[in-house]
């Protein structure tokens, strides 16, 4: 099979059913925790696989993973659409974490193309505050050269999430 199946002839209802089935399968594999778009949950699993430690409950404020040394890591993901360098990550409403790991996935293929680890103070310094949303929102342009490049580490962790899967893309 060369890429994703052709979905152009499916009705909207069928597309929604397919999305629900995919999210259900990802939940069954323990990779997502909500019925929201799964990329954020997958990104958290990537960081957990890379760093070990504990995946915090969804209700935990300000960070997603606590690594084995006790560092609190906020995970942000972007992907699935062509956004360019002006693409925005989800908002930061507090900075009670040690580092943020930003994962950027390619549109359509979801290959992990970039991963940056940035300390909380640096994120807060570059992300403008919006009173309307009561948060700070960083763009890809702002974070792509900050902190450490952890792309190789995160790609290796991403590959471990489905070790028995068959690669359908040739």
Where are these regions (language model features)?
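Nucleic-acid endonuclease domains
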Residues: 1-170
